[in-house]
Amino acid sequence: MNIKEVDVLIIGAGPAGSLAAREASKNGAKTLIIDKKSEIGTPKRCAEGIMSGVLERVHITPDERWIARKIDGARIVSPNNTSAWFTPETLETPATGIILERKVFDKHMTMDAIREGAEVMIKTEALSMKREGDGYLVDIKSFNKEYNQIKAHIVIGADGPEGHVARWAELNTKVPLAEMESGLQYEMTNLKMKNNSVIQFFFGSVAPGGYAWIFPKGYDTANVGIDISGIKAEKSAVKYLNDFIANCDETKDGQIVEINAGGNPLCGIFDKIITDNVMLVGDAAGCVSPITGGGIDTALESGMIAGRVAAKAIKNRDYSEEKLQEYADYIDSHLGKKFKKYIAIRDVLYNSSDEDLDEYITALANANITKLSTKSLIKVVMKISPRKLFKLRKILL
């Protein structure tokens, strides 16, 4: 058996895994990332949107090579096609964001980790993991066949919502069916968007228990997708998305150039995301917005903190759950509490009738909202439906 020994092994080279590797390496840990894919960043599994401020927070310098489109606003559309627009003309502080080219972005994040000293092995799959001594021994199947096992003091699971690290470490990350969304997205071109500098959200029976979206990537190109509830939907995601595209003036003449599909866990942060020698990050930890299913920003943040905590544990030669608790505490205070509020909003939003949604979004369209935030939107809606939204008052306001 050829065994490779490292301080920190990261399984999965997405945004969370690469940020964890960057920080662990920068802080002195011998770090290895493995990824089962032959090309990092493929296939993409999200709408690729991120708020501009996130990059600064996780110390990433914007690079035009992975920026597909810059965004300066949003549009929320009701079932009866009423639109609430939030643009630089209406907002005191524009809601700026970026639509990434994930295939390029993810690869660049891994390259940044390499520049900090991390090692990367692609087309390398983790097959099993067992405790050995003061760490874990991971069996792998690798393209280069140089090694078939890796010994690590700390293993970071960045292997997504269907990952194996959590199960191998006996961490419960099972998602209830009611909180798992089915997602389908087409990258399309030849679209006729009303404004190709805003992201658009469509709510109601067009996407039961979820929403449809148009995220522009160019003048006439966008990610067009849908998230639906596994227990509310009466048709397949393909049928809902195709119907949406056929009935939307902006998309009906478009052509598909790429198809992406996957599941989104909307349950919030899992109860336990660490144990002795193991941490979970990104989607594997439940770091996914319970409202939108978006997770790039939280993946980056969770990976960054996990990498720092891992390096500190390596320096202290203490890989216990108690030592790794610093990471779990950070996630709970910065994401967990916020996500619990988001779950309350989601439950109201996704259980509202089309008529209720028409009423809510019409109120937003007629309101003079100058600062776009969850709280400002809820305040407007509560004025017209205080009884229906009463349970949100204590949580949010």
Swiss-Prot record:
Q: Which InterPro entries match?
A: DGGGPL_reductase (IPR023590), FAD-bd (IPR002938), FAD/NAD-bd_sf (IPR036188), Geranylgeranyl_Rdtase_fam (IPR011777), Geranylgeranyl_reductase (IPR050407), GGR_cat (IPR054715)
Q: Which Gene Ontology CC terms are recorded?
A: membrane
Keyword entries, A-Z: FAD, Flavoprotein, Lipid biosynthesis, Lipid metabolism, Oxidoreductase, Phospholipid biosynthesis, Phospholipid metabolism
The catalytic activity, as recorded, is: a 2,3-bis-O-phytanyl-sn-glycerol 1-phospholipid + 8 A = a 2,3-bis-O-(geranylgeranyl)-sn-glycerol 1-phospholipid + 8 AH2; 2,3-bis-O-(phytanyl)-sn-glycerol 1-phosphate + 8 A = 2,3-bis-O-(geranylgeranyl)-sn-glycerol 1-phosphate + 8 AH2; CDP-2,3-bis-O-(geranylgeranyl)-sn-glycerol + 8 AH2 = CDP-2,3-bis-O-(phytanyl)-sn-glycerol + 8 A; archaetidylserine + 8 AH2 = 2,3-bis-O-phytanyl-sn-glycero-3-phospho-L-serine + 8 A
Matching entries from SUPFAM superfamilies are given as: FAD/NAD(P)-binding domain
- Binding positions for FAD? 16, 35, 46-47, 49, 102, 126, 283, 295-296
- Which cofactors, if any, are listed as required? FAD
Q: Which domain of life is it from?
A: Archaea
- Pathway involvement of the protein, from the record: Membrane lipid metabolism; glycerophospholipid metabolism
Pfam family of the protein (one): FAD_binding_3
Q: Which residues bind a 2,3-bis-O-(geranylgeranyl)-sn-glycerol 1-phospholipid?
A: 338
Q: What class of enzyme is it?
A: oxidoreductase
**Gene Ontology terms, MF aspect:** FAD binding; geranylgeranyl reductase activity; oxidoreductase activity, acting on the CH-CH group of donors, NAD or NADP as acceptor
Q: What remark does the entry make about the cofactor?
A: Binds 1 FAD per subunit.
Q: State the EC number(s).
A: 1.3.-.-
Transmembrane parts of this sequence: none
What are the GO BP annotations of this UniProt entry? glycerophospholipid biosynthetic process; membrane lipid biosynthetic process
Remarks, miscellaneous:
Reduction reaction proceeds via syn addition of hydrogen for double bonds.
| Protein function | Is involved in the reduction of 2,3-digeranylgeranylglycerophospholipids (unsaturated archaeols) into 2,3-diphytanylglycerophospholipids (saturated archaeols) in the biosynthesis of archaeal membrane lipids. Catalyzes the formation of archaetidic acid (2,3-di-O-phytanyl-sn-glyceryl phosphate) from 2,3-di-O-geranylgeranylglyceryl phosphate (DGGGP) via the hydrogenation of each double bond of the isoprenoid chains.
Q: Which family is this protein grouped under?
A: Belongs to the geranylgeranyl reductase family. DGGGPL reductase subfamily.
Q: Known PANTHER family for this protein? A: DIGERANYLGERANYLGLYCEROPHOSPHOLIPID REDUCTASE (PTHR42685:SF18), GERANYLGERANYL DIPHOSPHATE REDUCTASE (PTHR42685)
This protein is called: Digeranylgeranylglycerophospholipid reductase 3
- Native source organism of the sequence: Methanosphaera stadtmanae (strain ATCC 43021 / DSM 3091 / JCM 11832 / MCB-3)
